[in-house]
Amino acid sequence: MLRTMTIVRANPEGVHSTPGYHHVTVVPAGRTAYLAGQCPLDAAGALVGADDVDAQVDQVAANALAVLRSVGAGPKHVVRTVIYVVSADRSVLAQVWQRFLDSSLAPAFTTASTLLGVAQLGFPGQLVELDVTAALPDTP
């Protein structure tokens, strides 16, 4: 028999409101997937969108979706995200956040999420990286 996993996302009373994400995500014991940091690299390993934060977000989202699908999951199974952006400019951080919210990965960002401006990422020209944790759906 297939069990239905319930992921509970909440914003407790007494804590500030959020622009769409939740302060806490509770997952029953089960299988989890911890994705490596998703970078704006194409299948050949080449950087996509040097100096183009939107192109990099699009590639990162596509990569994250492909990796999630490879383990039978999708954006609705994501329980935590951390977005790293090479910028100290809040408008750039907001642009990246909005671009992810406008992507097919958008449901992943209704969960516990963190958005950070950083000094540097691993590849020359890399502006965006995404860490994802997902609670995998039960299997028959």
Can you describe what each PLM-predicted range is?
Residues 1-62, 66-79, 85-140:
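N-terminal presequence-like segments and the immediate start of the first folded domain
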